[in-house]
Swiss-Prot record:
One of its GO terms (biological process) is tRNA processing. The modification N-acetylalanine is found at A2. It is found in: Nucleus, Nucleolus. Residues 137-146 have a biased composition (Basic and acidic residues). Residues 112-154 are annotated as: Disordered. Its main location: nucleus. Component of ribonuclease P, a ribonucleoprotein complex that generates mature tRNA molecules by cleaving their 5'-ends. The keyword NADP does not apply. This is Ribonuclease P protein subunit p21. One of its GO terms (cellular component) is nucleolar ribonuclease P complex. Keywords: Acetylation, Metal-binding, Nucleus, tRNA processing, Zinc.
Length: 154
């Protein structure tokens, strides 16, 4: 069970702005400027408060003009092959900026991997404490005294 979320109100505001942009485009596809304003506001709030957004949300926003990327309406999607790998290329129709995403069914995003989950980190073996390399001066003094006394006897 998840604990309390830090900046819960900010995440709710981001969610509202993202949904509002979707609703505006769904009702009137010509009203892209208002949807872009909502997305730009959402992006600036997330940057100002240093909040990490989900990759699926970031992939639906243009990094150049903050437009909401809806295939066939505000962007084009093409499947390309490059060096044996399949890529999905999204091109924004407003600013012509393109983004490439790996189209591999076996690929997992970092957040979806088991080692990225906080619950699994607690299950792994605990970190071993580092050995104390700082020795006190008194640990070395008796050896030095013995060496000095032994050398003066000779």
């Amino acid at each position: 069970m998840a604990g309390p979320v830090k900046d819960r109100e900010a995440f709710q505001r981001l969610n509202f702005l993202y949904q509002a942009a979707h609703c505006v485009l769904a009702q009137d596809p010509e009203n892209q400027a208002l949807a872009r304003f909502y997305c730009h506001t959402e992006r600036t709030i997330a940057k100002r408060l240093v909040l990490r957004r989900d990759p699926s949300v970031k992939r639906t926003l243009c990094r150049g003009c903050s437009s909401l990327l809806v295939p066939g309406l505000t962007c084009t999607q093409r499947q390309r092959r490059c060096r044996g790998q399949r890529w999905t290329v999204q091109t924004c129709l407003t600013c012509q900026r393109s983004q490439r995403f790996l189209n591999d069914p076996g690929h997992l995003l970092w957040g979806d991997r088991p080692e990225a989950q906080l619950g699994n980190q607690a299950d792994s073996k605990p970190l071993q404490p580092l050995p104390n390399t700082a020795h006190s001066i008194s640990d070395h003094l008796p050896e030095e005294k013995m060496q000095i006394q032994g050398s003066s006897d000779q």
